[in-house]
């Protein structure tokens, strides 16, 4: 015979698991919340691989980056407010413009969006 307390504990555990699951939201890839997650991953990647980015920039001197990204890389505080307002097409251009986008950045961005319960949909 199962004790009522065991059933109650099981129900409580299931309820806690449901409550802990992040809410999901589907957004346009150009939504500023998506851009901020992408830029956060990008800034973290630059910090972790700074020499590689310097070499890439030296080899591609015409590639320009928004000044806000450079400020965020070297400001180790909360940089998300610095990155608001960068146009979505500029975010896409700088992030996808590096050779390691598909091998390193895209998986990290997908993971970060998923962790935040954000999924993207291409607008019709």
UniProtKB/Swiss-Prot annotation:
Q: How does it sit in the membrane?
A: Single-pass membrane protein
| Chief localization | membrane
Cell location = Membrane
Q: Name one Pfam family in it.
A: SRP1_TIP1
Keyword set, alphabetical order: Membrane, Transmembrane, Transmembrane helix
* Keyword hit for Membrane: yes
GO BP annotations of the record are:
fungal-type cell wall organization
Q: Where are the transmembrane segments?
A: 7-24
One function term, GO molecular function aspect:
structural constituent of cell wall
**Leader peptide range in chain numbering:** none
The record's annotation in InterPro entries points to: SRP1_TIP1, Yeast_SRP1/TIP1_CWP
Give yes or no: UniProt keyword tRNA-binding. Answer: no
A cellular-component GO term for this protein: membrane
Q: Which family does it belong to?
A: Belongs to the SRP1/TIP1 family. Seripauperin subfamily.
Q: What is this protein called?
A: Seripauperin-3
- Its gene is PAU3
